[in-house]
Amino acid sequence: PVYPPEHVAVIGAGIAGAATAYALASRGVRVTVLEAGAAAQAGSGNRQGLLYAKISAHDTEQTELLLGGYGHSRRLLDKLLPERENWQPCGLLHLNHNAAETRRNTQLAAQTRHAHLYRGVTAAEASVIAGIDILSDGLYWPQGAWLHPAALVRALLAHPAITLCEHQPLLS
């Protein structure tokens, strides 16, 4: 039989490290998170992040993995940040900002397999959704969300089986 570890160390207290620690702690493993600086710095320290599944226009295993992760992320946000002051599922407009994005978004809008997640919109439709003038077409993700990444990191690291050790640089 394979026995799970009793205690592990995770290096880094950004979103990836905090999520890894939380997943392990949720399965009964004690976790020590070692962070060279403070938790939720670098990209995880941004004031705001966007949540949507940046999937391929083609049906691939990676697309299915991303969609599964997207659904899991939404459920986890509901569980960890129920008050909605640090995230909001308010929808997201992904505008066509160059030729490559226009091609990609047009291909996505044409396929119907994931139509429950997004739909193509004209500039006029995007303007109505946003409440301001929008000059380009794009995709609308009604289930898209904004979030405060540092709040998510703090919520993940608050698990009772996680010990956070900040300002602990590792030497090679």
What are these regions (language model features)?
Residues 21, 25:
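Gly/Ala-rich phosphate-binding loop of Rossmann-like dinucleotide-binding domains
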Residues 49-129:
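Dinucleotide-binding Rossmann-like beta1-alpha1 core, especially the glycine-rich loop
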Residues 35, 122-123, 166-168:
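Short loop/edge segments at beta-strand edges and connector loops
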